């Protein structure tokens, strides 16, 4: 039985108020107890005690949406004007510069290293190369959810899919988007998840073009992208918004869904999100990079299932969750007010866990949860410890662990 005691000046449980000059007792990779250091030392004799000192101990970041497998593609991305232009670049790169399996694996491994060095302990990764990228993810020591990306070409095989799951690794389905998956494909994914009690993810409401597509209006997906892919148009129910489209087709019924981006969502749709218990994952820097707008963060402040993701380096500058958090904070501070720092840190931890439906395992410092923790030693301390986290950078990460096992520690 492995036992550890971590002491810190500040502990941010996320699920409760900050705790000062206390400790977290770990047993077999789980959080067992939080309390005063002296009391825990007396209670647990001969425990390995690591006094971290001045700094903040908090749950590891949950990067709730990435495309590590596309790391190789950055050398083909130059200037572009619109989201559609960017999609054309991605299609061209995949067609004319198809990556080798080694390139894909190297992209994933490089991404994993970047994630670990910037405080991520759980990653939700999209797998779009028929599983080539899964092996490095199984062995990376991060807590990993791999979403197998589904397009119409996979439709006939959905029933046969077998999803793997172990302590640190889990597979789920990810129909790409309403404009790239026909209603028939989405229906098959929904039925599969309903039958097998699985959740799925989807890119949803990312761009205005998607809203035009859903409304059966002229759009650049059908006009410009389908011809490049040799894809035929498909009939669909008309809806005013992507969220309404999913509701009309009953694709949320009885299943848990993690919806990524959710930029073009209307105020009245907040109630729909709550009623259907949808997990919302925001990628604000990616949205800015791709010029699709910014999510209605003030609306989402009311949600518990609200997470943050960096997306991939194909649509962002890096995979750094510290930078994602600070961008999120600075972008919406004026709109949301003084609670923005706490909201940003929540979305990067417990909110992300809830958006991925893994809050029973990770996301906060509570007894029974996995010891997926990070410790930062900020240069600048604010009165508000959440603001201190927001102001921190990856260079101030002093410790990262998953299941109580150290992943990163520059001092060791």
What are these model-derived regions, one by one?
Residues 56-57, 74-140, 161-166:
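Alpha-helical scaffold segments that flank or form the walls of functional sites
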Residues 72-105, 145, 208-254, 328-336:
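Active-site gating loops and adjacent loop-to-helix segments of metal-dependent hydrolytic enzymes
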Residues 370-412:
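C-terminal cap of metal-dependent C-N hydrolases
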